[in-house]
Regions:
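PAPS-dependent sulfotransferases, especially Golgi type II membrane carbohydrate sulfotransferases
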Residues: 1-5, 178-191
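Generic structural signal for helix capping and beta-alpha/helix-loop junctions
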Residues: 38-40, 112, 185
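Hydrophobic residues in well-ordered beta-strands that form the structural core
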Residues: 30-32, 80, 104
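Glycine-rich phosphate-binding loop used to anchor ATP phosphates in small-molecule kinases
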Residues: 67-91
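PAPS-dependent sulfotransferase catalytic domain
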Residues: 84-181, 189
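PAPS-dependent sulfotransferase catalytic core
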Residues: 1-74
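Residue-level preference for the first positions of well-ordered beta-strands
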Residues: 4-6, 77-80, 147-148
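Short, surface-exposed amphipathic charged segments that create phosphate/polyanion-binding patches used
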Residues: 45-49, 166, 190-191
Length: 191
């Protein structure tokens, strides 16, 4: 049985580092921002590398959902998915979300905006994903009847191993020490 983890974040929230931790497990496949190409195609926003992203990713949300619910690469038993809440446009049906272990990664708004504005000239509230994250959290809680896991990135960085151990325990999977370190640089799995 596959444990599917959907980490819902906004930009500049250590989401890539979190994905690296899971990717370094022996039993885990990762999926990096699968809705990004669809989001760019639908919104027409001018993001760096937008044409390349649109060309390299699936652009039909139904096919993306199927991939998220499907068998991960190499039939790994853990399937970690890094999602940006702002990429989950309103037209995308949410009925599939209860089939995932939904988690939410947060960071202090001031730190997010400061970090994001260093790489993007114009920043809007929609670019950050705060509103979408709250709406999605509420939707997941309503659909599942459970309280989704929320991880504060600042607190996570203070006690990384303890947080990862508790998270693995919550998911019913063993912790792997390989989650604590990984090689620097880009990976083939980068979206």
């Amino acid at each position: 049985m596959t444990t599917r983890i959907a980490m819902w974040s906004g930009p500049r929230n250590i989401s890539t580092a979190m994905m690296r931790a899971w990717e370094n497990r022996s039993d885990c496949a990762v999926l990096d921002e699968p809705f990004y190409g669809f989001y760019l195609q639908r919104t027409g926003l001018d993001h760096p590398g937008a044409e390349e992203v649109i060309a390299s990713q699936e652009n039909h949300w139904q096919a993306i959902v199927e991939k998220c619910l499907g068998i991960p690469a190499e039939s790994k038993r853990v399937f970690y998915q890094k999602h940006m809440t702002l990429h989950l446009l309103e037209e995308i049906d949410r009925a599939w979300l209860p089939e995932l272990n939904n988690c939410f990664l947060i960071r202090e708004p001031e730190a997010v905006i400061s970090s994001y504005s260093a790489v993007r000239a114009n920043v809007s509230i929609a670019d950050i994903g705060f509103v979408q994250q709250v709406e999605l959290y509420d939707a997941v809680a309503d659909m599942t009847g459970d309280t989704p896991l929320v991880i504060d990135s600042k607190e996570f960085l203070k006690r990384t191993e303890a947080h990862l151990r508790a998270w693995c325990d919550r998911l019913g999977i063993p912790f792997e020490a390989t989650m604590l370190t990984w090689p620097a640089g880009a990976r083939d799995t980068d979206g």
